[in-house]
């Protein structure tokens, strides 16, 4: 790979590619045709986490991705049943809930922390491994933990694991995020669905999912 002349290193150019000074688009022709839009992973994963709550959830147009498969495996570990029917995923969150996610499953999906709010809301406690192990200093997960504490969750750390408990049940509260984190917003929304009272999230994320 080499840098195109005049770009000061900002835009690398692959060897063997023709350098273009500009891209000219001539319109005027009517566009037509059919395009199939696949489901978005960033929307599917928090929905799958929320489907751990009581009742059956059917997610149509669910993408066939490794993260989605990992999420279904986590649901199965937690006591839910999840299976594919064509392009849909059917999840039944009824029955007893296992409150622990093994470290192996946590590492398969980068955003697996989004399951924390759902587990606590359903079971009242959760034990999961810390993403990245015992790190020093501020961590991305701290946003999630601080937000859930505002809903009454008591959180402790034990040799790379998080122990999260609620004395009675989750309660509503005002959650102010230091910055609009998508994952923390999703976690609070899922947990607040079964909390008693109203929850307000300030500085919430505005992404479509």
Name each model feature, range by range.
Residues 8-209:
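Structural preference for solvent-exposed beta-strand-turn elements
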């Amino acid at each position: 790979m080499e840098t195109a002349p005049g770009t000061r290193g900002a835009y690398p150019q692959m060897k063997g590619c023709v350098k273009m000074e500009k891209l000219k688009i001539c319109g005027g022709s009517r566009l037509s045709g059919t395009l199939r839009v696949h489901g978005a992973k960033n929307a599917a994963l928090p929905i799958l986490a929320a489907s751990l709550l009581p009742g059956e959830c059917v997610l149509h147009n669910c993408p066939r991705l490794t993260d989605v498969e990992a999420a279904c495996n986590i649901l199965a570990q937690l006591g839910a049943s999840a299976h594919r029917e064509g392009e849909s995923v059917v999840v039944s969150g009824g029955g007893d809930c296992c409150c622990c996610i093994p470290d192996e499953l946590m590492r398969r999906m980068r955003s697996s922390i989004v399951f924390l709010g759902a587990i606590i809301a359903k079971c009242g406690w959760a034990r999961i491994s810390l993403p990245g192990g015992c790190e020093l200093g501020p961590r991305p997960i701290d946003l999630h933990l601080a937000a859930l504490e505002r809903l009454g969750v008591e959180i402790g750390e034990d040799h790379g694991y998080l122990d999260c408990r609620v004395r009675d049940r989750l309660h509503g509260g005002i959650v102010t995020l230091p910055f609009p984190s998508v994952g923390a917003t999703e976690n609070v929304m899922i947990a607040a669905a079964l909390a008693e009272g109203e929850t307000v999230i300030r500085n919430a994320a505005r992404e479509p999912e």
